[in-house]
Amino acid sequence: MRVVFRCPPELIEVLPRPVPARDGLPEWLRAMPGEARVPELGGEVRTLKHCPPFIDAMRTGFLMPLAADVRVEGGAFRWDWALPATALGRTTRSPLSFHHAEQASGSPLHDPDRLFLKFNNFWTIELEPGWSLLVVHSVNRPDLPFQTLTGLVDADRYGDGLIHFPARWLDPAFAGVLARGTPVAQCIPVRREALELAFEPLAGETAQRFAELKDALASEPGVYRKRFRAGRS
């Protein structure tokens, strides 16, 4: 799957670049234990570190980075970023901007006391024909002080435009620096095709396979990882 990113030539050596999600896993995932003791069981259980679907979701697609350090203090957002001018003109020079909370009126997202941000993106994203881009908050990252909203962009057709990333600011007590490179969105290419839903009874050979797999899952660890997990580059 080829994804083409473009930016003004004056910014090509200035901007942080999108990275494959597999290269942007958080440090806490590496540091977390593989097992944890459960007093009620009197023993240990395997943690999320041993859950391939949890990790593979975090490794899928690519991450879009925050363009510059942003200092947050007392509800104010500040940055010191000398972005060069470009010959293209009419492009924002700020790593983030703001939405009005009223733009979410009537939805469960609306909260007049909660800031709505827009993380500005400086890279166009072009996908191969027939593919759209599912944009989500970085998967399994509740540790971030914001929540990026989900969107779907037909990036095979919109490859010459900039996709920005609206988000809700979740932590009013946060004080510190959102570092350049912080993942502000996870992007997953999806093929644009109609779904065909089929419903069948679990019987005969499928019922036998179901029973065999259920027994295997109950008798040994790592069955999914060893027998069913697909290889990923």
Language model: regions and residue ranges:
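Non-catalytic terminal segments and appended small domains
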Residues: 1-162, 168-233
